[in-house]
Amino acid sequence: MKLEFSIYRYNPDVDNAPRMQDYTLEGEEGRDMMLLDALIQLKEKDPSLSFRRSCREGVCGSDGLNMNGKNGLACITPISALTQPGKKIVIRPLPGLPVIRDLVVDMGQFYAQYEKIKPYLLNNGQNPPAREHLQMPEQREKLDGLYECILCACCSTSCPSFWWNPDKFIGPAGLLAAYRFLIDSRDTETDSRLEGMSDAFSVFRCHSIMNCVSVCPKGLNPTRAIGHIKSMLLQRSA
C-alpha cells in the first residue's frame, strides 16, 4: 500500500520561504501504524526532515502537529485516520507559533502564557498542617479533567484568539490549569489569581469556539473551565 505525504519544509539557514515537499512510503497491507512511525521511516530516507518526538505513547506532548488541517499528536494518530482516497496526507507544524525548522515550532510564547497563571500551589501558610494539606475525596475529585494536560499546545495553537493575541490571551491550556488551582482546596490565593486575570484579554478573549475541545488528545474540556473562570470573575466584580 503506497502512502503519499505532503510535508511542510522550512530551513531558515537555506530557504527563503517555506515549501511543501512530497514523500511516498510503502505501508504494509492490512497493518496500520501511527503517523510518528511513518515520519521516523521518512526521516531514515531523508535525514534533513525535522520534527519533535519523545515518549511515543501520547504522554509527553512533544510531537504535536497539524495533520490534514487538525492538530493532534503524531504518536497516537493512526495513518488509517488520515488516509483519504486520491489525497495526500498533509502535515504541517502547529499553527500560530514561529517555525524553527520544518515541523519544529518555538514554544516560547505558549510557555510564557502558561507561566502567567503561576501553575503551582500557593498557600499563605497561616494554618500549617501537622504533616500535609489534606483533601477530602470530593475535593480531590473536582480536579479530575483539569490536571491531566500534557502541554502539547494542540489546543492553544488551534485557537483563533491565541493566534490574534498570543501575548495577551492566556490560551486554553493555561486557563485549564488556572481553573485547576482556583478550585484546589489547598490553595489560598484565589483572589490574587483572579486579579491577575481580570483584564479584558487574559480570559474574556475566549469566544467558546471550542476548537480546543475538538483537538485535545487527552479528551479535556478547556472551554468549560474557561466558562467557570468567567463566572468567578463576574461574581467577583459584582
Swiss-Prot record:
It is an enzyme of class 1 (oxidoreductase). Binds 1 [2Fe-2S] cluster. Binds 1 [3Fe-4S] cluster. A ubiquinone binds at W164. GO terms for biological process: aerobic respiration; respiratory electron transport chain; tricarboxylic acid cycle. Its cofactor is [2Fe-2S] cluster; [3Fe-4S] cluster; [4Fe-4S] cluster. Gene3D superfamilies: 3.10.20.30, Alpha-helical ferredoxin. [2Fe-2S] cluster binds at C55, C60, C75. It comes from the Bacteria. Residues 1-97 form the 2Fe-2S ferredoxin-type domain. Pathway: Carbohydrate metabolism; tricarboxylic acid cycle; fumarate from succinate (bacterial route): step 1/1. SUPFAM superfamilies: 2Fe-2S ferredoxin-like (SSF54292), alpha-helical ferredoxin (SSF46548). Its EC number is 1.3.5.1. Two distinct, membrane-bound, FAD-containing enzymes are responsible for the catalysis of fumarate and succinate interconversion; the fumarate reductase is used in anaerobic growth, and the succinate dehydrogenase is used in aerobic growth. Belongs to the succinate dehydrogenase/fumarate reductase iron-sulfur protein family. This is Succinate dehydrogenase iron-sulfur subunit. The gene is sdhB.
